[in-house]
A protein has these predicted regions:
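Generic beta-strand or strand-like secondary-structure segments
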Residues: 3, 13, 54-58
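Short beta-strand-loop/turn "lid" adjacent to the catalytic site in phosphate-handling enzymes
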Residues: 4-48, 72-86
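Phosphate-binding/catalytic loop of phosphoryl-transfer enzymes
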Residues: 49-129
């Protein structure tokens, strides 16, 4: 940051990429002690984005500012029927790059003159974070 001309004290808050926490709705969340516990002992496994929550907390604590994470990969907004796998006793789980996909879908909806909620889009994440 300093190499780019910024100091941590220049910011009012920090935001890290969310990791594999418990399933939650899409949104912006304050990095809580529970979020820290979840990424330290991830309920759904390791993911590089778990570091985003830890780094945001660390930077926030250093500067005395709030730390947030947004649309983690554990976002679950699937309908009940979408959780049906076709195998008795086995449900489908929701894991996807919510931050990337929701961001581009919001941009596409705006270009179409629609709200995110009314747009009907197919978004494909082809890697790269």
């Amino acid at each position: 940051m300093e190499g780019a001309g910024y100091r941590l004290t220049d910011f009012d808050a920090v935001c890290g990429r969310g990791g594999l926490l418990r399933h939650i709705p899409s949104g912006t969340y304050l990095v809580s002690d529970q979020a820290i516990r979840d990424v330290m002992d991830p309920p759904y496994g390791e993911h590089a984005s778990n570091l985003g929550v830890l780094l945001a907390r660390e930077l926030g604590d250093m500067a005395g500012i709030p730390a947030f994470f947004v649309d983690p990969v554990c976002v679950d907004e699937m309908t009940p029927v979408a959780h049906v796998s076709g195998f008795r006793g086995m449900q489908r789980e929701s894991f996807f790059h919510a931050l990337n996909q929701k961001s581009i879908a919001r941009k596409a909806a705006k270009l179409l003159g629609k709200s995110y909620e009314e747009a009907r889009l197919t978004v494909v994440h082809v890697g790269g974070g």
